[in-house]
A protein has these predicted regions:
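Acidic, Ser/Thr/Gly/Pro-rich intrinsically disordered interaction regions
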Residues: 2-51, 58-222
Length: 222
């Protein structure tokens, strides 16, 4: 088709945008959905969830390998063959063995495993679901997780941008637990390494105690 004929035919993508803008009554952003809406904020929050979760997975593998005493040169070779569930089970089993006489450390590591699993569940629900648009509000208030080999029916969860931000913050708290547990272990091994000699492992373990975050709310089928 010649350039002149293309010009006469117009740009199909622009025609489509014009159609939907006239139908909906507000402008369409072709990349992020609805202009000037909370939907953009949802996408930003999802990006934060992904970035923080990537860090959590790295911390989990590093922490578990170090705690289990896997030599540093071969630790990456071992850990890359384990999925998140296997790594969590390995850390829990090592804790049961190593902390046989240290109930406080065993409790803290078990909490870490539970927190990691809860954040993993919420993150997986988010990233494997689709945002459901609330057109009048120009936002999203639900997500739908499609059917899969493990679930015959799609599942709908209540989920606003605040829920996504909360999950991102939960993952950030998880990453803080990794750091505080590492400090507690180092303090137990050599208290002189810290600038404040009065610090004890219990001071760091105390920072690892809080309520598990909630799961996303599953809505009843309509």
């Amino acid at each position: 088709m010649s350039d002149s004929l293309q010009d006469e035919a117009g740009d199909p993508s622009k025609d489509a945008d014009s159609y939907w803008q006239n139908l909906l009554g507000f402008p369409i952003d072709p990349w992020l959905g609805i202009s000037d809406s909370a939907l953009k904020e949802c996408y930003v929050a999802l990006g934060v969830v992904s970035e923080r979760w990537n860090r959590s997975e790295k911390l989990m593998r590093f922490f578990t390998a170090h705690y289990a005493g896997i030599p540093e040169p071969i630790a990456p070779l071992v850990m890359r063959h384990l999925n998140n569930l296997s790594v969590t089970d390995l850390l829990s089993d090592c804790s049961d063995f190593i902390e046989n006489d240290s109930a406080d450390f065993r409790e803290a590591i078990e909490f870490l495993c539970k927190l990691f699993s809860r954040c993993r569940e919420n993150r997986n629900t988010l990233v494997h679901s689709s945002l459901v648009l609330n057109i009048p509000k120009r936002s999203a208030d639900r997500i739908i997780k499609p059917s899969s080999p493990r679930a015959a029916e799609a599942k709908t969860f209540a989920c606003t941008v605040d829920d996504i931000k909360r999950i991102a913050d939960d993952i950030q708290h998880l990453n803080g637990v990794f750091v505080n547990l590492a400090y507690a272990l180092e303090c137990r091994k050599d208290p002189t390494k810290f600038w404040n000699p009065s610090r004890t492992p219990a001071d760091f373990l105390r920072l690892c105690k809080f309520h598990l975050p909630d799961k996303l709310t599953l809505l009843a089928p309509e």
